[in-house]
Amino acid sequence: MAPKKGVKVAAKKKTAEKVSNPLFERRPKQFGIGGALPPKKDLSRYIKWPKSIRLQRQKRILKQRLKVPPALNQFTKTLDKNLATSLFKVLLKYRPEDKAAKKERLVKKAQAEAEGKPSESKKPIVVKYGLNHVTYLIEQNKAQLVVIAHDVDPIELVVWLPALCRKMEVPYCIVKGKSRLGAVVHQKTASCLCLTTVKNEDKLEFSKILEAIKANFNDKYEEYRKKWGGGIMGSKSQAKTKAKERVIAKEAAQRMN
């Protein structure tokens, strides 16, 4: 018989062993029950929130998931922070009088009438509020600027207001939020505010604000009228959809081959 050829075994590569310092002991952590404390992470989704907060969170998520029609979606496009700050500075100059100021004015007026002095009473320039009042001013073409809150509940109260403003060619803007508008007029909340005129010293600043607002809202009305919102699914749902798409693409490629 012919001698068998020896099969050479491939020599194993020598790996350099890591030299560990004997002073440092390895102590792997066990994160099971009764073990080490787990690392900190965001646990907000496991918190049992109060019912009012739970409803707020669910409402916000639903608005992201469901398809939102353009009439409602336009209320997500609010005035930018810098422009809103300058707008509220102007609005605060024309705050209506509060109860204390009104009482003081009426007392002075009564004293003047008692003394027989003529009381000068000029109509003050103030911010108008109240949905019916603001609507009337828009219809009469007296409104120069309409400010609408983005978070009015129910939204049906003001959903038609941008269309009316555009029809009557009145500049309008949507701002955050109803409590901030309410603070201007000494109320808890306000759905909308309106300015009919301003003083001469504020006309230059007011005209600049109006130009910016027209460019952001009145001129873009047609664009916002066609833009739907929502339809954004969660991360788990998106991952499932991508996995399905990959499987379908793979099957299509196999068929082609």
From Swiss-Prot:
A Pfam family assignment: Ribosomal_L7Ae
The UniProt keyword set, sorted, is: Ribonucleoprotein, Ribosomal protein
Q: Name one GO biological process term.
A: ribosome biogenesis
Listed PROSITE patterns: RIBOSOMAL_L7AE
- Molecular function per GO: mRNA binding; structural constituent of ribosome
Superkingdom, taxonomy of origin: Eukaryota
Q: Which GO terms describe its cellular component?
A: cytosol; cytosolic large ribosomal subunit; cytosolic ribosome; nucleolus; plant-type vacuole; plasmodesma
Q: Which PANTHER family match?
A: RIBOSOMAL PROTEIN L7AE FAMILY MEMBER (PTHR23105)
Provide the protein name: Large ribosomal subunit protein eL8z
Starting at the broadest rank, the lineage of the source organism is:
Eukaryota, Viridiplantae, Streptophyta, Embryophyta, Tracheophyta
Q: Which gene encodes it?
A: RPL7AA
